């Protein structure tokens, strides 16, 4: 019996080798990336207007941290960071719009959770902003801690993780509050400003952004309490893994670029670098782009268009911006934070 099996296996070897060879370096299959190329434009879902993250200006152009992620993807895939159509979405609309194919990718301060990924058929393409839920109160309340908020009316936006977490937090601390949910960020902030509620809760970065919209920003205080982990990042549909990989690795490329010292100011030097890890990143060695179905210089395209992660952060939300948010956990792992990305190799 064994004498018959061995020749059979030897006969199958060439076919198996061909099959494995075909599977090893298959570029991105037909799907979202092909639709984006045929259309010539990336359709990216963003917020309806959040300072520092996705903000539409008077001339109808967009800017912000999440906007730059969209532009980086467009640069990697289409070679032009300007080829993006931005679709403003409320928290309640965002995942439905993605699931129904109305947008190619969601870059809208969205928290990665089990329910959203497994329950909604979505894939979160890594974390690009480590946040946490916080509280903003009127300064004249003289409150210094969330543990002093018993009996308060709390404003929260519907369709966010904060809506459930605020009840969990106060319940766990044996405190009673009245939670009022609003359909969008604008109405939530309006309710806070007109004192329909005396507390507003959302991601801490969002509180910094929303406070700037108040007629008297100095009249509001952001408390030091952080009551949750809110890992934010871009989102794709789960039915197109090739596209998910592209979005994920563009996200990772921006982080890796900062770690490698590659920025929008030294693209030419990166292309000539003698360092193996920089050469792989730049596409000079390795031919890694074809595994994603992209040109070998895909990562450099992204960085050239919007800068590395550090540049994006500081320009939009960092200490040099209107928001002035310290990097904190969003500092590189080698600099005291927890931000890191798998290597490009």
Locate predicted features.
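Short helix-initiation/N-cap motifs at beta->coil->alpha
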Residues: 84-96, 179-194
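Extracytoplasmic small-molecule ligand-binding "clamshell" domains
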Residues: 35-109, 294-298, 305, 309, ...
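Acidic, polar ligand-binding/catalytic clefts
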Residues: 71, 75, 79, 83-148, ...
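Extended ligand-binding regions for polar small-molecule ligands
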Residues: 68-71, 75-77, 139-143, 147, ...
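Ligand-binding cleft/hinge of the Venus flytrap
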Residues: 57-58, 71-82, 124-126, 162-181, ...
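Bilobed "Venus flytrap"/periplasmic-binding protein-like clamshell domains
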Residues: 43-52, 62-77, 111, 131-183, ...
């Amino acid at each position: 019996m064994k004498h018959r099996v061995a020749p059979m296996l030897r006969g199958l070897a060439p076919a198996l080798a061909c099959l494995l060879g075909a599977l090893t370096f298959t570029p991105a299959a037909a799907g979202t990336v092909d639709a984006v190329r045929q259309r010539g434009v990336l359709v990216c879902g963003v917020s309806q207007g959040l300072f520092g993250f996705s903000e539409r200006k008077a001339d109808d152009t967009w800017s912000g941290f999440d906007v730059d992620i969209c532009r980086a993807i467009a640069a990697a895939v289409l070679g032009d960071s300007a080829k993006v159509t931005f679709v403003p979405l409320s928290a309640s609309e965002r995942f439905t719009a993605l699931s129904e194919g109305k947008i190619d990718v969601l870059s809208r301060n969205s928290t990665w959770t089990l329910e959203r990924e497994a329950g909604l058929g979505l894939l979160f393409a890594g974390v690009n902003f480590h946040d946490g839920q916080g509280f903003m109160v009127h300064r004249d309340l003289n409150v210094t801690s969330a543990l002093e908020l018993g009996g308060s009316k709390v404003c929260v936006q519907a369709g966010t993780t904060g809506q459930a977490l605020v009840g969990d937090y106060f319940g766990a601390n044996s405190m009673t509050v009245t939670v009022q949910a609003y359909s969008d960020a604008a109405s939530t902030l309006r309710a806070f400003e007109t004192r329909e509620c005396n507390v507003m809760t959302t991601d801490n970065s969002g509180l910094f952004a929303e406070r700037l919209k108040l007629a008297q920003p100095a009249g509001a205080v952001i408390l030091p309490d952080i009551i949750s982990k809110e890992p934010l990042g871009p989102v794709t549909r789960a039915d197109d893994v090739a596209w998910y990989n592209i979005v994920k690795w563009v996200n990772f490329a921006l982080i890796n670029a900062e770690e490698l010292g590659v920025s929008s100011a030294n693209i030419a030097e990166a292309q000539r670098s003698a360092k193996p890890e920089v050469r792989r990143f730049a596409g000079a060695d390795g031919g890694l782009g074809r595994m994603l179905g992209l040109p070998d210089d895909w990562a450099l395209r992204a960085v050239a268009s919007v800068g590395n992660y550090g540049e994006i952060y500081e320009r939009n939300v960092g200490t040099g911006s209107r928001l002035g948010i310290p990097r904190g956990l969003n500092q590189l792992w080698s600099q005291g934070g927890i931000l890191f990305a798998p290597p490009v190799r």
